[in-house]
């Protein structure tokens, strides 16, 4: 299995060769040369598998340069009930991603039972173990540079803390995460973790990461790696829970399901797209945005129009406060028939601060063939959805999951199960839950008092040169 760049000007590489990086040298994103296919018979064989067996079956089709026995050990080490221990009462932590039935054909897919209470743990824990393995095999070290709007940072840091050969430099928008998210990250005292609070918004952080990644000399000299959602291994890991969710709510492979996905950087729903391309019977992939609705605009109009920092809203679902969806390029590559020259043309416009219209050339008309639909929500919608869900079903959901549920209800079809991806637990967004319900959400006892722990972080300007200098001084 080789991986190619969406921009077509980088050599095809193996999984381990692209694992530690992010962007391809030509600025594109990596995808498999062709997607592995799972036949109806294969799906039937997978139906009864536990999460570890399912993950190994899927990942071994995407990773063929790590010996199967070693990959099996890595997967088994990653997906354990004691790692994903924060299941709801009545759920079995051994399921790793249990489903929670709200009503007939409407479910939550619980992806947030890991150490940082967010779905990012599903991929990041695997990434930490893969990084440690591959670095040890190569006798190398890496310095991870990442950007977070809230959940990626803590998931990356908890996955990489104490790992041999790894240092983490994580950029976050200063004072724009929830208190819980901030405390989760900044309270870590591990010597290999560095938190940098950037004066700006998430897209400023992401732009700095891209600028550093595109400085090939600096990247090579300082062994810069990436764990943001552009990292292929993260997307690959997320493919697994679409299969797990599908099997949990269907009796046979003749049935289709839909997934509603709270969306910012498009990485999570991109994994759903890839699962669908691999043969999973998915009816609809519902892209749910908040007020930062660049993706909703595209799926309704065919126009992709990223906003600048000044036009990016700070909302009550902050992990989705993103207006340049970095994984979107992967889907567009497939949409335009894997025409790398076309992708280079389109992202040339984006990288220059512009937009593009896929009605030109008739590409937008093909979006329906891939099952995508979309919708957006605002703060009032989120508060109402949290309140209604609590009253009707006796369950508390966070603001991002509320975005997903609100839009899911707009796209339900009779007889087709709809799984809403629960992307974070409500304890991470206490203020919003208090506003919606009048009381604080429950949080795991082990996380009581998190906000009062000592914090260690640096506040810096949104300047790639300043960040580079800090990295050089601390590696």
Swiss-Prot record:
What is the E.C. number?
A: 4.2.3.1
Residue ranges of the TM segments: none
Recorded catalytic activity of this chain's protein:
O-phospho-L-homoserine + H2O = L-threonine + phosphate
Q: In which pathway does it act?
A: Amino-acid biosynthesis; L-threonine biosynthesis; L-threonine from L-aspartate: step 5/5
Alphabetized, the UniProt keywords read: Amino-acid biosynthesis, Lyase, Pyridoxal phosphate, Threonine biosynthesis
Q: What class of enzyme is it?
A: lyase
Positions bearing N6-(pyridoxal phosphate)lysine: 120
Give the required cofactors: pyridoxal 5'-phosphate
Q: Which PROSITE patterns match?
A: DEHYDRATASE_SER_THR
Instruction: Check the record and name the PANTHER family matching this protein.
Output: THREONINE SYNTHASE FAMILY MEMBER (PTHR42690), THREONINE SYNTHASE-LIKE 2 (PTHR42690:SF1)
Q: What does this protein do?
A: Catalyzes the gamma-elimination of phosphate from L-phosphohomoserine and the beta-addition of water to produce L-threonine.
Q: Which family does it belong to?
A: Belongs to the threonine synthase family.
Protein's name according to its UniProt entry = Threonine synthase
């Amino acid at each position: 299995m080789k991986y190619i760049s969406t921009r077509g000007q980088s050599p095809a590489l193996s999984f381990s060769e692209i694992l530690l990086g992010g962007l391809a040298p030509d600025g594109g994103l990596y995808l498999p040369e062709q997607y592995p296919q799972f036949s109806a018979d294969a799906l039937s064989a997978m139906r009864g598998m536990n999460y570890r067996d399912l993950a190994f079956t899927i990942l071994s089709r995407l990773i063929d340069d790590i010996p199967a026995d070693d990959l099996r050990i890595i997967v088994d080490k990653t997906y354990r009930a004691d790692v994903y221990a924060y299941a709801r009462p009545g759920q079995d932590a051994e399921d790793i991603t249990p489903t929670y039935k709200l009503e007939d054909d409407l479910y939550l897919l619980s992806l947030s039972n890991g150490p940082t209470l967010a779905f990012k743990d599903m991929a990041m824990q695997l990434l930490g173990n893969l990084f440690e393995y591959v670095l040890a095999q190569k006798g190398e070290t890496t310095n991870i540079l990442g950007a977070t709007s809230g959940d990626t940072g803590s998931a990356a840091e908890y996955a990489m803390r104490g790992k041999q050969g790894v240092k983490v430099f994580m950029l976050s928008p200063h004072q724009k995460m929830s208190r819980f998210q901030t405390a989760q990250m900044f309270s870590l005292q591990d010597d290999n973790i560095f938190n940098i609070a950037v004066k700006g918004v998430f897209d400023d952080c992401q732009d700095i990461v891209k600028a550093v990644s595109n400085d090939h000399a600096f990247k090579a000299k300082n062994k810069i790696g990436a764990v943001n959602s552009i990292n292929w291994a993260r997307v690959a890991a997320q493919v697994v829970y679409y299969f797990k969710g599908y099997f949990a709510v269907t009796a046979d492979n003749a049935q289709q399901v839909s997934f509603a996905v709270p969306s910012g950087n498009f990485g999570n729903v991109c994994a759903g797209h890839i699962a669908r391309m691999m043969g999973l019977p998915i009816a609809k992939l519902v892209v749910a945005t908040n007020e930062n609705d660049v993706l909703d605009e595209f799926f309704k109009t065919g126009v992709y129009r990223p906003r600048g920092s000044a036009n990016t809203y700070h909302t009550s679902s902050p992990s989705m406060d993103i207006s340049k969806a970095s994984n979107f390029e992967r889907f567009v590559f497939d949409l335009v028939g894997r025409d790398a020259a076309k992708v280079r043309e389109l992202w040339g416009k984006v990288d220059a601060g512009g937009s593009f219209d896929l009605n030109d050339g008739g590409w937008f008309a093909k979006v329906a063939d891939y099952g995508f639909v979309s919708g957006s929500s605002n703060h009032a919608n989120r508060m109402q959805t949290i309140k209604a869900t609590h009253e009707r079903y006796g369950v508390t959901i966070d603001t991002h999951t509320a975005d997903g549920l609100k839009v899911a209800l707009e796209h339900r079809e009779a007889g087709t199960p709809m799984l809403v991806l629960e992307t974070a637990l409500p304890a991470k967004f206490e203020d919003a839950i208090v506003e919606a319900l009048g009381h604080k959400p429950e949080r795991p006892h082990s996380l009581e008092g998190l906000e009062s722990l000592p914090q260690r972080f640096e506040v810096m300007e949104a300047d790639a040169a300043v960040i580079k200098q800090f990295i050089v001084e601390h590696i």
